[in-house]
């Protein structure tokens, strides 16, 4: 511990990059039991990172919920518009996906352990390539991340979680 008046500067804390998977965005933009935890997770630390895969999966989840009549088309459009507005405001950092990410994902899948779904392998490859910690609500994805020794935080609903807010209008993450 540096004493007052010493010439030593306090060490700056490095900001950890956080890669946000689709399950967290769904909980954030739609009313779900994990909505409040997703909001806290997104606000913690620096600018959260996403990939084009997250953008595509988010739109796909909304479309699936509309087809299953779990979500009104107007609500899906509103969630998508708000997500896009947040992107335009710079509230997310976009991590591009390149050939090296596909190669790494393929190597992990070809190793047969841990069990990996195709798109999960790609999410993990993007996170690993950026040196990012994964924030997810997907238990299987979190298990795979930990098996690959990647930093990961799993959002879980606690016993008392009944809030299902969603579609927040926030000023900043």
Language model features with spans:
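Short, well-structured N-terminal submotif of metal-dependent ribonuclease cores
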Residues: 2-56, 61, 65-81, 148-150, ...
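Active-site-proximal, substrate-binding regions of enzyme catalytic domains
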Residues: 56-112
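Short gly/pro/ser/thr-enriched loop/turn and capping motifs at secondary-structure boundaries
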Residues: 58, 142-143
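Residue-level detector of short coil/turn "hinge" positions at structural boundaries
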Residues: 72-73, 116, 134, 152
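Active-site neighborhoods of divalent-metal-dependent phosphate/nucleic-acid chemistry enzymes
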Residues: 89-140, 146, 169-173
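Structural signal for conserved beta-strand scaffold positions within catalytic alpha/beta enzyme cores
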Residues: 96, 154-156
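C-terminal binding/interaction regions
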Residues: 139, 152-153
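Short acidic/polar capping segments at secondary-structure boundaries
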Residues: 139-141, 158-159
């Amino acid at each position: 511990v540096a004493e007052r008046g010493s010439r030593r500067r306090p060490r700056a804390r490095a900001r950890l990059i956080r890669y946000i998977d689709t399950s967290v965005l769904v909980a954030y933009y739609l009313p779900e039991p994990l909505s409040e935890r997703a909001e806290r997770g997104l606000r913690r630390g620096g600018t959260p990172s996403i990939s084009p895969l997250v953008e595509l999966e988010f739109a796909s989840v909304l479309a699936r919920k509309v087809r299953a009549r779990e979500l009104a088309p107007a609500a899906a459009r509103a969630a998508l518009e708000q997500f896009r507005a947040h992107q335009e405001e710079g509230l997310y950092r976009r991590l591009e996906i390149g050939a090296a990410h596909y190669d790494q994902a393929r190597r992990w899948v070809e190793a047969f352990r841990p069990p990996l779904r195709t798109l999960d392998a790609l999410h993990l490859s993007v996170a690993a390539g950026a040196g990012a910690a994964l924030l997810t609500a997907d238990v299987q994805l979190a298990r795979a991340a930990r098996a690959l020794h990647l930093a990961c935080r799993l959002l879980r609903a606690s016993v008392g979680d009944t809030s299902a807010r969603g579609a927040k209008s926030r000023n900043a993450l």
